[in-house]
C-alpha cells in the first residue's frame, strides 16, 4: 500500500474537531495552566528522543498549534509536516510558524491520523501528541503512523496518563475532576471549561480500555521495536518511543 485511502471522518474525529475548534487563541498558555506547568517539559522530552537521530524529514500528527513542530524544526534543522483535524488550530499554528521564521521548513495541513495522505516510509521520524484518545481504533492508527515511517526511524508520542501510586492517583482524580474545570472556566471561558470537564473522565476511561501493556503491544504489532515508556510528573503524563524494524 503506497498511500492511504480517501479520508472518511469518524464520530471521534468530529467530536475532537468540535471540542478544540474554539481554543486556538489561548491554547498554548492554557495548556500549561491545565497541565500544572508540565506540558512544556513533557514536550521537551518527546522532542529530545526524535532530535537525537537528526532526522531530515519529520511528521508531527495532531500538531495543534504547531508547538511540537516548531521545537522539532529548531532542534533538528530538518523539515516538518504537521497534520491536524482542526483548521482553526492549524491557522494559529501557521501564525506561530511565521513568527518563528520557519515557513520554509514547516508545512501544516488538515488530515486524519487514521488515513494519512503520504506514501510508505515517507518520513525519518514521526511524532504524535494527545492523539489516541480521539480515534476509533488506536491499534489501526498506530499501524498507519508506522506505515509512513521509514525502517529504522523513530516513532514517539506524548499523552496524559493516570498515576499508579494510590496517593498520587487520588490527588490526580481531584485535580482533573474539580480543579481543571474551574481553572478552564476562570482562564479560558466556556470552551476551556468543556475541555477541563471532559479530560479527567476521558483519560481514565481510555486507560481502562487501553492500558500501557496493550498500547505497547499495538506498537510492536505495527513493527515498532525497542519500545520504551517513561511516565512523567509522578504519572500525570507519559512519553513513549521506539524504532521501526528493518524488513
Task: Say what each PLM segment does.
Residues 114-125:
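A short acidic, Gly/Pro-enriched loop at the edge of an enzyme's catalytic core
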Residues 153-160:
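Conserved beta-strand signature within the Rossmann-like core of class I S-adenosyl-L-methionine
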Residues 139-151:
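A short glycine-rich, Lys/Arg-flanked "PGG" loop and its adjoining helix->strand segment in the class I
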Residues 124-138:
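A short SAM/SAH-binding and catalytic strip from SAM-dependent methyltransferases
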Residues 222-247:
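Core SAM-dependent methyltransferase catalytic element
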Residues 57-115:
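Class I SAM-dependent methyltransferase SAM/SAH-binding core
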Residues 162-218, 228:
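C-terminal alpha-helical "lid/dimerization" subdomain adjacent to the S-adenosyl-L-methionine
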Residues 35-56:
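Conserved alpha-helix/loop element of class I SAM-dependent methyltransferases that forms part
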Amino acid at each position: 500500500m503506497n498511500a492511504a485511502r480517501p479520508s472518511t471522518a469518524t464520530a471521534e474525529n468530529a467530536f475532537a474537531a468540535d471540542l478544540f475548534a474554539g481554543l486556538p487563541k489561548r491554547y498554548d498558555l492554557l495548556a500549561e495552566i491545565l497541565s500544572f506547568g508540565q506540558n512544556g517539559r513533557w514536550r521537551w522530552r518527546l522532542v529530545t528522543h526524535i532530535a537525537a537521530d537528526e532526522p531530515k524529514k519529520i511528521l508531527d500528527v495532531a500538531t495543534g498549534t504547531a508547538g511540537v513542530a516548531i521545537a522539532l524544526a529548531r532542534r533538528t534543522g530538518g523539515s516538518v509536516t504537521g497534520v491536524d483535524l482542526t483548521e482553526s488550530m492549524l491557522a494559529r499554528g501557521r501564525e506561530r510558524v511565521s513568527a518563528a521564521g520557519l515557513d520554509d521548513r514547516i508545512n501544516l495541513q488538515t488530515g486524519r491520523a487514521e488515513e494519512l495522505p503520504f506514501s510508505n516510509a515517507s518520513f525519518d521520524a514521526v511524532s504524535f501528541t494527545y492523539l489516541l484518545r480521539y480515534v476509533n481504533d488506536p491499534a489501526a492508527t498506530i499501524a498507519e503512523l508506522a506505515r509512513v515511517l521509514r525502517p529504522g526511524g523513530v516513532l514517539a508520542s506524548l499523552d496524559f496518563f493516570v498515576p499508579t501510586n494510590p496517593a498520587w492517583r487520588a490527588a490526580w482524580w481531584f485535580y482533573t475532576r474539580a480543579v481543571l474545570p474551574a481553572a478552564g472556566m476562570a482562564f479560558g471561558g466556556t470552551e476551556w471549561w468543556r475541555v477541563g470537564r471532559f479530560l479527567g473522565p476521558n483519560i481514565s476511561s481510555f486507560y481502562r480500555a487501553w492500558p500501557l501493556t496493550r498500547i505497547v503491544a499495538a506498537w510492536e504489532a505495527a513493527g515498532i521495536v525497542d519500545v520504551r515508556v517513561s511516565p512523567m510528573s509522578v504519572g500525570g503524563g507519559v512519553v513513549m518511543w521506539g524504532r521501526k524494524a528493518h524488513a
